[in-house]
Amino acid sequence: MMTMWCLTLFVLWMLRVVGMHVLRYGYTGIFDDTSHMTLTVVGIFDGQHFFTYHVNSSDKASSRANGTISWMANVSAAYPTYLDGERAKGDLIFNQTEQNLLELEIALGYRSQSVLTWTHECNTTENGSFVAGYEGFGWDGETLMELKDNLTLWTGPNYEISWLKQNKTYIDGKIKNISEGDTTIQRNYLKGNCTQWSVIYSGFQTPVTHPVVKGGVRNQNDNRAEAFCTSYGFFPGEINITFIHYGNKAPDDSEPQCNPLLPTFDGTFHQGCYVAIFCNQNYTCRVTHGNWTVEIPISVTSPDDSSSGEVPDHPTANKRYNTMTISSVLLALLLCALLFAFLHYFTTLKQYLRNLAFAWRYRKVRSS
């Protein structure tokens, strides 16, 4: 037991040292009210949404596969058939998903919406070694079956949920009917193709850089002002800047205005937003970049308060200000006294020297 614990700690330490990449694909098939099916595939690498495939059964010819981040242009340049291959793969998966949706809707019944999800994920080290994998299928937001841990055994859902419990026989039968060969194919994919592409993506990927955020108040006039919030140096360029007032988003009549998203010379981006607000109110600027969020408090005082020379909520600063004022007055009085004394002394000395010179001349005249 102790040996396994030490081995687990060692593996976790190694992952921390060498780093780890996570490549995940999520497939979502949906039947709408008109029995048309849509399939959307989303690729995420290290938290960056890099790929999307979409098709609708009403127009299969319009299926499209697109890179959704700047470094995917380099992947497409290095592998010219990449997007065509992903589109062809998506078209095949669409046909399988349509059949599975029909089967599940008949077996499990129509609920709030007929939604089939499928996720697979592989975790690799920086040097391309496979660490862990995952395969899972879900229906209407609940997991039906999963392949994880050592990737040899499929497990079922949480049967405490009533509608899953009602269909336990069907679900257990589906899991039991998964052949060892099918499981091997999934395992080999996660350890092979998925891991290989994770290494390829890591060579083209631009690392995530979260922004430096600054907020404050400007253009203050009477009882109105602008609260601004600017984010610098972030990548990728997808960012959300909102203003929160008393725990809620800014009201509709004061929606924030955002400047265009602009690139910088180092490949990152910056963007600023502002909102018109009343004075004597507290706002919070909330910036979300991927799974990273920061909040900057912004307080606005009225011009009357700011012109009084007082610093709100800082009595120590007020006391320091008063002390400095008194010291300045005393110093000025002392300098005036010294200047007066010097002028008085200089005038007296000048008069004394003049009298002394006159007496010397008078003595010299009498002696002659």
UniProtKB/Swiss-Prot annotation:
GO terms for cellular component: host cell membrane; MHC class I protein complex. Its main location: host cell. The chain crosses the membrane at residues 326-346. Keywords: Glycoprotein, Host membrane, Host-virus interaction, Immunity, Membrane, MHC I, Modulation of host NK-cell activity by virus, Signal, Transmembrane, Transmembrane helix, Viral immunoevasion. InterPro entries: Ig-like_dom_sf, Ig-like_fold, MHC_class-I_related, MHC_I-like_Ag-recog, MHC_I-like_Ag-recog_sf, MHC_I/II-like_Ag-recog. The keyword Ribonucleoprotein does not apply. Plays a role in the protection against host NK cell cytotoxicity by interacting with and modulating the activity of the host inhibitory leukocyte Ig-like receptor 1/LILRB1, which is expressed on monocytes, dendritic cells, as well as subsets of T and NK cells. UL18 exerts an inhibitory effect on LIR-1+ NK cells, while it stimulates LIR-1- NK cell. This is Membrane glycoprotein UL18. It comes from Human cytomegalovirus (strain Merlin) (HHV-5).
